[in-house]
A protein has these predicted regions:
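Donor nucleotide-sugar binding/catalytic pocket of nucleotide-sugar-dependent glycosyltransferases
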Residues: 51-90
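Conserved donor-binding/catalytic core segment of Leloir-type glycosyltransferases
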Residues: 93-124, 132-135
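Glycosyltransferase donor-sugar binding loop
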Residues: 104, 131-145, 161-162
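Nucleotide-activated donor-binding/catalytic signature segment of Leloir-type glycosyltransferases, i.e.
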Residues: 145-163
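Aromatic "clamp/platform" in nucleotide-sugar-dependent glycosyltransferases that forms part
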Residues: 183
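Short hydrophobic beta-strand element within catalytic cores of glycosyltransferases
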Residues: 200-203
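Conserved acidic donor-binding segment of nucleotide-sugar-dependent glycosyltransferases
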Residues: 215-216, 220-227, 236-241, 256
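C-terminal alpha-helical cap of glycosyltransferases
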Residues: 260-273
Length: 273
């Protein structure tokens, strides 16, 4: 039984599923999605041990999560990265005459949505032609707060709401920089997808991001909640296209290893064990 496991309320759902599997004598495999799961290990050590120590295997989709769990004494963690079907993400070479920012995530407090709007405002203040598209569903009221914040800062943001995978991939053709503003993260599929599409990524330096993106080689990582550092990184990408193209090529090469045709062999090994 595969159990998607997150750090929020879903953690308790995962706990109940794991205990039911134990009663029914079924092997279960938690898939460790939440970038804030290490804090959950600290806050709920007993429940965590009941879930993870008894698991057939725990799947860490990032080296960050695997290292964090091993730091708490969990040795039955296997690294299998989040996957994409690479054929669905056509690589596109972009130009950077103007800045067109793309943000893709659910509108949740932990993803610090307002920072993206602040970045756009700061770019406008510096007389840099820039646009921002924010793709994702409402989760905890953050979408409405973001719309209100955009009005307060007098900036125009394209809020699309939730889009299908194909729809946002198609829309991404009109944008040239991907920003990730989160305060907590693991190994987000949206970042992998952006790297596959040829979008240079500027992200906060949190959670699993340094394990996914080597700073200055495959994208740019900055401190969280610092709009000025994002703007500096964005303008750096614009001013140095050759260096930007080098990072884009490195990023694409890395995520080619996350293609399902490659990763599925690891899954088959776990599920047949």
């Amino acid at each position: 039984v595969l159990i998607d496991t997150y750090s929020t309320f879903n953690f308790y759902f995962a706990y109940l599923c794991s205990q039911l599997c134990r009663i029914l004598k079924l092997k279960y495999v938690p898939i460790l999605h939440g970038g804030n799961l290490p804090n959950r290990l600290k806050k709920n050590p007993k429940l965590s041990k009941d879930i993870f120590n008894k698991a057939h295997k725990n799947i860490g989709p990032s080296l960050y999560i695997m290292a964090s769990f091993k730091g708490f004494g969990y040795d039955n963690v296997v690294y299998i990265p989040n996957t994409i079907e690479l054929k669905n993400y056509p690589f596109q070479k972009r130009t950077f005459d103007n800045i067109h920012l793309l943000w893709v995530r659910s509108f949740s407090k932990i993803y610090n949505t307002n920072l993206a709007i602040e970045i756009l405002s700061l770019l406008n203040e510096k007389n840099t032609d820039a646009t921002l598209c924010m793709v994702g569903p409402e989760n905890d009221g953050s979408l409405q707060k973001a719309k209100k914040y955009a009005k307060e800062l007098n900036v125009e943001v394209n809020f699309t709401g939730k889009l299908s995978k194909q729809a946002w991939v198609t829309r991404s053709q009109d944008y040239n920089i991907f920003i990730n503003t989160t305060n907590f993260d693991n190994m987000p599929v949206s970042i992998i997808e952006a790297m596959a599409l040829g979008l240079p990524v500027v992200s906060t330096h949190v959670g699993g991001m340094p394990f996914l993106i080597e700073n200055g080689e495959e994208g740019i990582l900055v401190a969280p909640n610092q709009a000025d550092l994002f703007v500096k990184a964005i303008k750096q990408l614009q001013a140095n296209p050759d260096e930007t193209y080098r990072m884009i090529a490195n990023a694409r090469k890395k995520v080619e290893m996350f293609d399902w045709e490659i990763v599925k062999k690891q899954w088959f090994g776990i599920l047949s064990g």
